[in-house]
Amino acid sequence: MKVTYEIENGKKIKVKTYVDGTVFKYDENGNKIYYKDNDGNEDWKEYDSNGKVIHYKNSNGREDWYEYDSNGNKIHSWDNRGYEYWQEHDANGNVIHLKDNDGYEKWYEFDANGHCIHFKDTDGIEWWSEHDANGNKIHFKDINGYERWC
């Protein structure tokens, strides 16, 4: 591996080049901003001031954008293929609601230890689970009547 530095847009960039042709580039904060594999596939990332990815694109034409709340939780994302989704989080950062632009929704409920104890979606899937004091799942039940004690 060879490490070099270059200046891009007035900023110092760390470049790692491997013998097989793979290249990684990192910004001044250590965030990976560029990757190229030995087959020529590439991807690029842009970050906000908190180190969260706000824009991603690759050499295959994919492009994604992300927005975050003040706690750093991803709350909105969309891409150049027309897909878009929104997320809500609880005080612990767990995703409790997800909705996409096709109308599909998911809801999650967590216990005080961060274990998912209830799931429901717009396709009619719903289940519940219980955990012991060590976090091990001890009971599972779904809306169709399936039940398992672990």
Task: Describe the predicted segments one by one.
Residues 14-150:
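A detector of tandem-repeat and repeat-rich interaction/domain scaffolds
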